[in-house]
């Protein structure tokens, strides 16, 4: 990609109200610019001062940044701390009885847990893990429903220095096995079932299936939380019930004091080569990013009630459910269910009931709720809201305006946040009391984040032209490496084209005349479906694993609810099916992908051809397939196409 023309033109702008600005922690654009200047002029002391102010250290650090082995950066590396201590223990003296979590189950039952109670539960479970032989540096895979126990598990791992790797509960047995195998996990923590939308979904059965596959032999124990009355198949000697494990365990557990650069967790994200990437985050740098961005981006105040709707299986649930809110001593809502069960007013009812003041959700959820009409939110008292946020993908301006007017009543700033699994915390977003917002733009980088848009040579592109989004200086919460694959880390994020100097985000973007950033999409073959990144190669590999399939190529096309829909172009081993036969095979392949990877990756559209469009060198012409998927006129040069006759076949929907 050199540069791209920007198609989206948005001129509407919304400044923070005088009342909001007056009460904001960072108030007015001058305050924002002052922080940016401070970071630009004294970069290391800027981050060092924040780390000293916000983190409780067992042993203070003496050096802020070691970049001698760039791009393997080390921050605060001689400091000693514990993430769980920073999220729990340090709040007990003044806020032991403050509510930490308001958990609402799928059926509406509400459980409130104080910081004191959460600390007790974490210590007991941490001691339980220690009784299973889990020690500092061991990897624990977490395959749990959204709930208090998921947070307890993650915090317990952090407390004893174990490295957690949370796997989204919708992933298949094969995906769970792949992550167990790559991490070398010794323990899996799961539940017998999860409950979503009134339906029980088996989790332990999926773990059992994963552990029966080759490559999962490292697992010694499976801890099972009994979420429902449903049973679970049992392997004596390996499986242990959660309630039995914590029985009689001490309610105190001394934290394992960790080096600042010791790994806190691994979170797997999709890669364009098919093999998931184990994104490894450090203890201190990651914690600082989550902690500080939470208070800045959401203008957090001690009496706020925060609700992030993300699952802990994704980075948003790590940074803005498990770590950011708790490190700030916040009260937050955690929700097990879905926004449309038992009816489409569920989100609004919960905001009213729990007096939520900061609401952070995905554009996918907003778009799905828009389809149900504007009357529904108006039936609820949403006056407690003061900040709205979006995450996971760019939000289209129309959805932004609906969110702003219908949900926020035209008084709540919207923080459209751009960041990634790899960045660990928010990078570009409006500070709500300082920056005027524009529908569809994530606006300006946070102070201390040196973001830019460049062409293939690394030169800055002019406003209105698209290019590569890069971050030019290291920052504390940046991914440290890809687990067990440092070469892939360098090649993916610090490529030779930029002399290894810039972090390449993998997104294209442009800047407008005010310097605001507008995200345009992915530059690689990773799809963004409902805010979740899915590798095309993983889906293609799953399709080709079906005995009927010879070859497959997967691309995305715009979808009004999910952001992107999965479109698969498939060549069968037998003849190209047509009519009802094609529909039958397509249905079978969709179910196959759902089983192999998870429902989230299920193709929305499958097209059959006798072949795929390839260059004479055998390379699949994916840009051509994207045009076909979108129903666009083919304008690409097809002179190098080996088999132009198959284009007509692939343009025919079922």
UniProtKB/Swiss-Prot annotation:
InterPro entries: Ac_CoA_lig, ACAS_N, AMP-bd_C, AMP-bd_C_sf, AMP-binding_CS, AMP-dep_synth/lig_dom, ANL_N_sf. The modification N6-acetyllysine is found at residue 619. GO terms for molecular function: acetate-CoA ligase activity; AMP binding; ATP binding; metal ion binding. ATP binds at residues 392-394, 416-421, 507, 522, 533. Keywords: Acetylation, ATP-binding, Ligase, Magnesium, Metal-binding, Nucleotide-binding. GO terms for biological process: acetyl-CoA biosynthetic process from acetate. Its EC number is 6.2.1.1. GO terms for cellular component: cytosol. It catalyses: acetate + ATP + CoA = acetyl-CoA + AMP + diphosphate. Acetylated. Deacetylation by the SIR2-homolog deacetylase activates the enzyme. It is an enzyme of class 6 (ligase). Mg(2+) binds at residues 544, 549. CoA binds at residues 196-199, 316, 530. The keyword ATP-binding applies. Its cofactor is Mg(2+). The keyword ATP-binding applies. Belongs to the ATP-dependent AMP-binding enzyme family. Catalyzes the conversion of acetate into acetyl-CoA (AcCoA), an essential intermediate at the junction of anabolic and catabolic pathways. AcsA undergoes a two-step reaction. In the first half reaction, AcsA combines acetate with ATP to form acetyl-adenylate (AcAMP) intermediate. In the second half reaction, it can then transfer the acetyl group from AcAMP to the sulfhydryl group of CoA, forming the product AcCoA. This is Acetyl-coenzyme A synthetase. The gene is acsA.
């Amino acid at each position: 990609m050199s540069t791209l023309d920007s198609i989206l033109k948005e001129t509407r702008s919304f400044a923070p109200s005088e009342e909001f600005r007056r009460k904001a922690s960072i108030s007015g654009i001058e305050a924002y610019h002052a922080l940016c200047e401070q970071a630009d002029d004294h970069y290391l002391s800027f981050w060092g001062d924040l780390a000293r102010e916000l983190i409780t250290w067992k042993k203070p650090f003496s050096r802020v940044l070691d970049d001698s082995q760039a791009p393997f950066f080390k921050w605060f590396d001689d400091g000693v701390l514990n993430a769980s201590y920073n999220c729990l223990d340090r709040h007990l003296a003044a806020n032991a009885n403050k509510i930490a979590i308001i958990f609402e189950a799928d059926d509406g039952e509400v459980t409130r847990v104080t910081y004191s109670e959460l600390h007790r539960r974490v210590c007991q479970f941490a001691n339980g893990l220690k009784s299973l032989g889990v020690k500092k540096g061991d990897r624990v895979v977490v395959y749990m429903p959204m709930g208090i126990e998921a947070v307890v598990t993650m915090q317990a791992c952090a407390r004893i220095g174990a490295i957690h790797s949370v796997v989204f509960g919708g992933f298949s047995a094969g995906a769970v096995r792949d992550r167990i195998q790559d991490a070398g996990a010794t323990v899996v923590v799961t539940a017998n079932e999860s409950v979503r939308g009134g339906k029980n979904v088996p989790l332990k059965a999926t773990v059992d299936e994963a552990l029966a596959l080759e490559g999962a032999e490292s697992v010694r124990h499976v801890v099972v939380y009994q979420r429902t009355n449903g049973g679970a198949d049992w392997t004596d000697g390996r499986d242990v019930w959660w309630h039995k494990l914590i029985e009689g365990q001490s309610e105190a557990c001394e934290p394992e004091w960790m080096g600042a650069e010791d790994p806190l967790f691994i979170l797997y994200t999709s890669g364009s080569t098919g093999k998931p990437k184990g994104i490894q985050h450090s203890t201190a740098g990651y914690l600082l990013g989550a902690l500080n961005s939470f208070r800045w981006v959401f203008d957090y105040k001690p009496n706020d009630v925060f609700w992030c709707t993300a699952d802990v299986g994704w980075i948003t649930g790590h940074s803005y459910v498990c770590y950011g809110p708790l490190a700030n001593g916040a009260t937050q809502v955690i929700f097990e269910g879905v926004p449309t069960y038992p009816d489409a007013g569920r989100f609004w009812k919960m905001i009213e009931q729990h007096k939520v003041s900061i609401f952070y959700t995905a554009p996918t959820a907003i778009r799905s709720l828009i389809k149900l009409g504007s009357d529904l939110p108006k039936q609820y008292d949403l006056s407690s809201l003061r900040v709205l946020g979006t995450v996971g993908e760019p939000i289209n301006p129309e959805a932004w305006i609906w969110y702003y007017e219908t949900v926020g009543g035209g008084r709540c700033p919207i923080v459209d946040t751009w960041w990634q699994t790899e960045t660990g915390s928010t990078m570009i977003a409006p500070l709500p009391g300082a920056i005027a917002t524009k529908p569809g733009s994530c606006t300006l980088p946070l102070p201390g984040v040196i973001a830019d848009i460049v062409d293939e040579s690394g030169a800055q592109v002019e406003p209105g032209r698209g290019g590569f989004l890069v971050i030019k200086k290291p920052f504390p919460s940046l991914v440290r490496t890809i687990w067990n694959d440092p070469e892939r880390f360098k090649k993916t994020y610090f490529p030779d084209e930029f002399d290894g100097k810039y972090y390449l985000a993998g997104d294209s973007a442009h800047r407008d005349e005010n310097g605001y950033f507008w995200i345009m999409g992915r530059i690689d073959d990773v799809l963004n479906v409902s805010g979740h990144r899915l590798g095309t190669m993983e889906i293609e590999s799953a399709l080709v694993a079906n005995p009927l399939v010879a070859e497959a190529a997967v691309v995305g096309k715009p979808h009004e609810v999910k952001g992107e829909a999965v479109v698969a172009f498939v060549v069968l081993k037998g003849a190209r099916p047509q009519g009802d036969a094609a529909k039958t095979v397509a249905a079978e392949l969709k179910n196959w992908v759902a089983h192999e990877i998870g429902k989230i990756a299920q193709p929305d559209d499958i097209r059959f051809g006798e072949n795929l469009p390839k260059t004479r060198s055998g390379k699949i012409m994916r840009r051509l397939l994207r045009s076909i998927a979108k129903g666009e006129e083919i304008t690409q040069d097809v002179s190098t196409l080996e088999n132009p006759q198959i284009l007509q076949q692939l343009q025919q929907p079922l």
